[in-house]
Amino acid sequence: MTRTITGDVSGALADLGILVPLTAALVVVNGLDVGSVLLIAGLLVVTAGLVFRIPFPVQPLKALTALAVAQHLAPDVIHAAGLEIGVVLLVMSLTGLATWLSKLFTKPVIRALQFGVGWLLVVTAVKLVLKPPAVFVHSPSSRTGLLLAALTVGVVMIAAWRRWYVLSIVLVVVGVIVTLLVEQPSFGGPSIDLPTFSIPPWSVFGTAFVLLVIPQIPLTYGNAVVGVSDLAHQQFGERADRVSPSRVALVCGLGNLVSATFGGMPMCHGSSGL
């Protein structure tokens, strides 16, 4: 496998395509603290790299985020869901259930789940363009948004076909430049605002489980436990010997417990980032 600086930098940006829009939605629509969210996410990325010793994705939970944004759920509900998902994944790992169930997930099942996650993101993105939340005060027209989306998808498909891996770097740079030119944001001075430990009130755990955890767990296990393990071994061979469904579930479970209690967002190891 030939490595280049361009390839490494481009690969390092892979998760941003999922991380940035979903994080922005949870912060703007649901009121999560952006500092806590980004700090915890960064720590989980570093931890995943140290544990698995290969490039390993860390992303927000897609179905959970889509449902939370659509229903404008409060931060306490989202954090409660993160705790519950963390506990479920830990139980699956420590009891051996994660390994046993992985035998039932054949490649067609894994690919179908990955397709479903991708389709969910497409539908959510189109809804945000056609009917943006009221908090998006400077939203472009739906026609402009759909045109930009179609253009971007076309460019990405051509780049993937031609193997222009530098495209992710270009897209990020262009996005930053366009944002600075269009919005002309103001910059404040630096400040230190560390996350604080907190537990959501017990009254929200039932709501979180029904609305967010039940729809998310099958996708998380299929795509971000079994799917990412299968893809890691396919892409990295022997270098992925640390990756297994049980270990991925363990790391993801612990990560969600930490994230939920320190103001972060529910996370997973979605295979799309790998």
What residues fall within each predicted segment?
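Membrane-embedded helical hairpins/re-entrant loop segments and their flanking transmembrane helices
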Residues: T2-T6, L26-T47, P215-L274
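Short, amphipathic, aromatic/basic-enriched membrane-interface segments that mark the entry/exit
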Residues: I5-A12, V28-L32, G49-P55, P132-T144, ...
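Hydrophobic, small-residue-rich membrane helices and short re-entrant helix-turn-helix hairpins
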Residues: I5-T6, R162-V173, D193-P200, F209, ...
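Hydrophobic, membrane-embedded alpha-helices of multi-pass small-molecule transporters
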Residues: T6-G7, A14, S141-T152, W164-L167, ...
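Helical membrane-embedded segments and adjacent short helical loop/helix-boundary regions
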Residues: T6-I18, P55-P57, K103-V123, T207-L211
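Transmembrane helix-boundary motif of multi-pass solute transporters/channels
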Residues: S10-L73
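C-terminal ends of transmembrane helices
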Residues: V45-P55, L89-K103, V153-W161, V225-Q234, ...
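Membrane-embedded alpha-helical modules
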Residues: H72-F187
